[in-house]
């Protein structure tokens, strides 16, 4: 069985039970992508860093209504707490498992 959680806040980890499910399965690495970079992606990365996860933001799988904000976050803010990767990087890593 897959774990299915409902998201009620911008942050995908807060109040969803996802953190508990991940820890129960000894999962410490999170690959984060989505819309909007300035919303769910940023909020989830910040909270995930506080929870000591290893974070990977998939740059080419994130977007924002403001391209300048997206670029600023990807290049200046998110790298402080996450590794910025491409979808190609993720595919290669998964194939190597």
Listing of model-derived features with the role each one plays in the protein:
Residues 1-97:
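Active-site-adjacent betaalpha module
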């Amino acid at each position: 069985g897959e774990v299915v959680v409902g998201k009620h806040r911008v942050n995908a980890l807060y109040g969803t039970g996802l953190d508990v499910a991940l820890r129960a399965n000894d999962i410490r690495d999170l690959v984060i992508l989505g819309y909007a970079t300035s919303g769910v992606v940023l909020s989830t990365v910040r909270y995930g860093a506080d929870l000591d996860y290893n974070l990977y933001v998939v740059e080419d799988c994130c977007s924002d209504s403001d391209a300048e904000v997206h670029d600023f976050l990807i290049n200046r803010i998110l790298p402080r707490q996450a590794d910025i990767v491409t979808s190609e990087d993720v595919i290669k890593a998964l194939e190597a498992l």
